[in-house]
Amino acid sequence: MKNRLVIFGLLILLMMSSCIVYHPMPIDIPLISEKNDFRVDAGISIVPSANATVSYGLTDKIAIQGFGSVGADDRYYIQAATGLYKNKGNNKVFELYGGFGYGYGNAYKDANPGNLLGDYQLYFGQANFGKISSSSSNFETGFGLKAGYLHSNLTDKNYYGWTSETGPFKIYHDESILFEPVGFIRFGGNRLRINVKLGGTLIYKFTNKDRNLPYSYLNLGIGLNYRL
C-alpha cells in the first residue's frame, strides 16, 4: 500500500511537470568545513530537470556557490550565492548564504488551451546545518531553509482564460515571498557519494492574488557528489 502511494505521488509530480512555472530546486547543501573545501554535485530530479552545483571554501569563513538547472518546456534557473560557514566541531557545520537567482518557466493548461510563460528573479537568504563525514563514516546528512523575495514577469497567453489567438497578451508583474525547506542524505565512498535531496516550496503572492502562480510543492533529486 505504501509503495503504491509513493508511485502515485511520483506520477502526479511527473504529470505536473508541464503545468508549472517554478519548482523546488535541488541545490546542493555543501556543508563547507574549511578553506579550499571544494564540492561538485550533479544530478536529475523527479520534476524533469538536470542540474549541477559547485561550492568552494574561499577562506576560513567565506564560501561561494553556483548552481544551474535546465528542464522540460524550456525551463531553466541559475543561481549564485556567497556566505559564511562555521565548523562547530564533532563534524557539524553551519552555513549562512545570501544570493540571487534568475529563471524562466512555461506552464501549459490544455483546458483553454494556453500558456503562462516568462522570467523571474529571486533574492534570498539560506541557512544550512548538518553533519559531514568522519574517519569512521562516509554518511552525511543535513537540512536547509531558504527564504526570499520573488519577482516574476509572466505573459498570459490564454492560460487564465481565452482572450485572443494572436495577442496582444497581458503581462503580470508579481511580487511574492518564497520559502524552501530541503533535506538531504549522502552516502558512498570517501570522496564520491550518492546524494539524495527532498525539497519543498511555498509561495505567497502579494499582487494579483486572484491569478495563481503555478508551481510544484515538492521535488526529489538524486545525483553524485564529489568532494576534493
Where are these regions (language model features)?
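Hydrophobic, lipid-facing positions within transmembrane beta-strands of outer-membrane proteins
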Residues: 36-38, 46-52, 62, 76-82, ...
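Short glycine/proline- and aromatic-enriched beta-strand/turn motifs that initiate or cap beta-hairpins
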Residues: 19-74
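Flexible, solvent-exposed coil segments and beta strand-coil junctions
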Residues: 31-35, 57-63, 104-110, 160-165, ...
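Transmembrane beta-barrel strands of outer-membrane/channel proteins
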Residues: 40-44, 66-70, 80, 96-104, ...
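Repeated loop/turn-to-beta-strand initiation elements of outer-membrane beta-barrel proteins
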Residues: 50, 60-66, 87-94, 136-141, ...
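Outer-membrane beta-barrel transmembrane domain signature
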Residues: 109-228
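Cleavable N-terminal export/targeting peptides
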Residues: 1-26, 228
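Ligand-binding grooves and catalytic loops that recognize ribose/phosphate and carbohydrate rings
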Residues: 72-135
